[in-house]
């Protein structure tokens, strides 16, 4: 099949997107498809209409690729694509909607979820620029359970751009100012410590299944932008090392199952399809969900590739399956 790989784009994640696209193209060739590389620009519609691909794979990271923009356009053009639909992408892209979707899923099913998420608040830039919200920064310590340190992050940005750990009021002010340069909405929430994990998922609905959780260990500092972009500054353990979860093997296995269940709850709550990743932290008592990715990188040094390898799956085989679906 002729598959258009949409890559590049103009977001802060352009370079990562190009690397992801090249990996996907190589995998498609190995799976005996005919890939067409398209660097997303103002000529995209004309290029797609001229190329007439059988389907598309969105490899654009960040805005446009993960917020439903490209997916909506492909819907309008009548071109099938791999992964979740445009409405799902729009919901997933906004991290501030996580708790609402999870609560709705819990109410619908009548069951208590095992997934949890950090408590916090979301503010628009207008509140700080025009309504004087900086004058209430001192209240965050009391309003968010546990107080400092606090996590500050743009609501709709990836690769941890604009994410900060604020240890006091002054750091919080600086973190807010920086985060607002990336997005008009910013989240301030509990800072969660623990085992950092990513659970990649294949399939849709009740047929979706989790691949082995990948443990993420930065060699220095936090797993923020530099660590996510540099393959030589972070180690992936797939599956997660049991000793990282508990010294007792049976307890660790039970925790791993709970982590996988939590990721699947989030995936299904948003109505995701095809493939995706759920990033979370095991804090020693529960799985704290941080964010969801509808277009995870398939680059050679990525959590998705690590999870596939741990499952005995090849990226070409996974892509072939996604295209056929």
Protein language model features and the residues they cover:
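A short glycine-rich, hydrophobically flanked beta-strand micro-motif that places a catalytic Asp/Glu
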Residues: 36-41, 186, 190, 197-198, ...
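ATP-dependent carboxylate activation and anion-phosphoryl transfer catalytic cores
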Residues: 248-325
């Amino acid at each position: 099949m002729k598959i258009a790989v949409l890559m590049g784009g103009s977001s802060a994640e352009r370079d990562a997107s190009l690397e992801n696209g090249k990996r996907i193209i190589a995998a498609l060739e190995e799976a005996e498809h005919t890939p067409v590389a398209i660097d997303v620009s103002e000529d995209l519609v004309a290029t797609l209409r001229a190329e007439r691909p059988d389907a598309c794979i969105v490899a654009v990271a960040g805005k446009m690729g993960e917020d439903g923009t490209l997916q909506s356009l492909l819907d309008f053009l009548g071109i099938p694509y791999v992964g979740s639909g445009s409405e799902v992408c729009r919901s997933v892209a906004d991290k501030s909607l996580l708790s609402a979707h999870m609560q709705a899923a819990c109410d619908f099913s009548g069951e208590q979820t095992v997934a949890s998420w950090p408590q916090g608040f979301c503010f628009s830039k207008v509140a700080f620029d025009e309504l004087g919200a900086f004058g209430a920064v001192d209240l965050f310590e009391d309003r968010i359970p546990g107080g400092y340190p606090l996590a500050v992050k743009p609501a709709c940005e990836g690769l941890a751009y604009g994410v900060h750990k604020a240890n006091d009021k002054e750091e919080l002010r600086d973190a807010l100012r920086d985060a607002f340069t990336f997005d008009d909405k910013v989240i301030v929430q509990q800072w969660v410590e623990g085992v950092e994990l990513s659970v990649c998922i294949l399939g849709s609905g009740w047929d979706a299944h989790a691949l082995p959780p990948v443990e993420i260990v930065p060699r220095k500092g936090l797993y923020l932008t530099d660590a996510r972009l540099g393959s030589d500054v972070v180690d992936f353990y797939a599956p997660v090392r049991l000793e990282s979860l508990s010294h007792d093997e049976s307890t660790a296995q039970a925790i791993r199952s709970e982590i996988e269940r939590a990721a699947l709850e989030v995936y299904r709550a948003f109505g995701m399809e095809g493939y995706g990743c759920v990033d979370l932290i095991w804090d020693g008592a529960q799985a704290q969900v941080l964010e969801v990715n509808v277009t995870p990188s398939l680059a050679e040094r990525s959590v998705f590739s690590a999870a596939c390898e741990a499952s005995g799956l090849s990226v070409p085989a996974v892509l072939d399956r996604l295209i056929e679906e």
